[in-house]
């Protein structure tokens, strides 16, 4: 990718409209603080460009392979801004809560919820779901979500996606684009995760690159 192209792309990258630059923490006596404005940088810009190009080429799925430290969750948040409804799937609640904060920072939106444990939000623009909950077939129906409810789906730690619960989610929903994130694409059981993303890897980078 030409460096000038990336610079131009970075300059033209726009966030969604911001209604307010202030927000209140979810504490009764918390002070109102200025929310930082987050922008993509470095390898994230290259990855965003690659993802946009692969969608222009007609791809509906893609895998980004990047080492820990590159900022894959923020990358997904930046890439999601053109899509209205987003689903982020992970296997740990801690990851989901961290991801929610990242997406909130980038999209400047409090219209998000969780689908995990006892919490079953179904009417938000951003849903952060545990695979253990959403991956159950009892939740994959029109009572909870229409097949096309989400425009953009992120599967964190995509190397786990060959498991049955991840498969249930991937097979049920019909998003405009599905993004897989991983630092470790190889699995010891030799199951092929590349097949799940149509063998499309728009971007990969190691931490030292």
Predicted regions and their residues:
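ATP-dependent helicase/translocase motor core
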Residues: 1-67, 74-86, 101-105, 123, ...
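Conserved phosphate-coupling serine/threonine residues in phosphotransfer and NTP-handling enzymes
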Residues: 68-70, 182
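Conserved helix-turn-beta segment of the N-terminal RecA-like "Helicase ATP-binding" lobe
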Residues: 86, 93-119
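Conserved nucleotide-binding/hydrolysis micro-motifs of P-loop NTPases
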Residues: 93-95, 120, 132-135, 159-160, ...
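Conserved helix/coil segment N-terminal to the catalytic DExD/H
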Residues: 117-149, 163-168
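Local beta-strand N-terminus motif with an aromatic residue
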Residues: 124, 150-151, 175, 197
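Conserved Walker B
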Residues: 150-153, 157-159
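Post-DEXD/H (motif II) to motif III coupling segment of the RecA-like Helicase ATP-binding lobe
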Residues: 159-209
């Amino acid at each position: 990718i030409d460096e000038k192209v990336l610079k131009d792309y970075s300059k033209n990258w726009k966030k969604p409209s911001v209604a307010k630059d202030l927000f209140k923490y979810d504490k009764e006596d918390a002070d109102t603080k200025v929310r930082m404005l987050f922008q993509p940088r470095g390898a994230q810009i290259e990855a965003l460009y690659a993802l946009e190009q692969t969608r222009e080429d007609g791809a509906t799925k893609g895998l980004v392979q990047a080492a820990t430290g590159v900022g894959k969750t923020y990358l997904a948040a930046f890439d999601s801004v053109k899509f209205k409804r987003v689903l982020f799937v992970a296997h740990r609640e801690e990851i989901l809560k961290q991801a929610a904060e990242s997406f909130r920072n980038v999209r400047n939106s409090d219209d998000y919820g969780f689908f995990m444990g006892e919490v079953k939000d179904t009417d938000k623009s951003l849903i952060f779901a545990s695979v253990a909950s959403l991956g159950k077939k009892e939740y994959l129906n029109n009572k909870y979500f229409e097949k096309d409810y989400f425009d953009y789906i992120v599967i964190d730690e995509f190397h786990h996606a060959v498991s049955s619960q991840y498969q249930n989610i991937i097979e049920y929903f019909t998003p405009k684009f599905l993004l897989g994130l991983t630092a470790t694409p190889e699995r010891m059981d030799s199951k092929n995760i590349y097949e799940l993303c149509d063998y499309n890897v728009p971007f990969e980078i190691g931490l030292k690159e």
